[in-house]
Amino acid sequence: VKIAFQTAAKRNHHVTLVDKANVLATSKLWRRIANQVAKEFPEISFDSCYVDAAAMKIISAPEKFDVIVTENLFGDILSDEASQITGSLGTIPSISRGDHGPALYEPIHGSAPDIAGKGIANPLSMINSVAMMLDHSFNRKDLAKRITDSVNKTIEGGTTTPDLGGNSKTTVVTNAIIKRIEEN
C-alpha cells in the first residue's frame, strides 16, 4: 500500500483502493491498513471503491484513476479489463513489488499458447515492462521515456500486430521499435 502512495507522489497524486469491504473480511483489513498509510501521505488524495464499481468506472471514466492499489485477484481482473481501453491485452506492462527486495516486471497477458509459433504475439507489453523496470528499479527515466516514445511512434506509424488491427509480425514490430530507440 505504501508503494502505491510513493508511486502517486511521482504522478498525479491520487490513490484509489479497490476492495470488496462490504463483503470480504480481507478487504476490511486492506481498507483499514490503507487508511492508516494514507495519513502518512497528506499530499496524496485517497479514496476507496468497491471492485464492482471500479470495474464500471474503469470503462466509463478511466481518467478518474491514477494509481490503483488492490489485492491480486481484483488486480488481475481489472488490469485485463483496462487493457481493452488500449485495444489489446498485448500492450500492458505490470509490476509486482514490495517494500524490499526485487520487483517482478512482466506483461499482464499469459503465454498465449494458441498463437505460439505464429509470429503474431504483440511484443509491446514486454517492451513496456522493460521501460517500467528501467524507470522504477534503475531510476533511468530517460531510457524508459526513449522506449515508450519509440513504442508510441511505432504504433502511430501503423506498425502493429493483428490484435491492434495491423498485419505486422512480432519481429517486424520489435525491430521497428529498436530502430526508433537507436535513432533517439
Protein language model features and the residues they cover:
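Alpha-helix boundary/interfacial micro-motifs
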Residues: 36, 83, 88-89, 139, ...
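Loop/helix-junction capping segments adjacent to catalytic residues or to phosphate/diphosphate-binding pockets
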Residues: 24-28, 141, 171
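Glycine-rich phosphate/nucleotide-binding loop
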Residues: 58-158
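A glycine- and small/hydrophobic-rich beta-loop-beta segment
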Residues: 43, 60-65, 179, 183-184
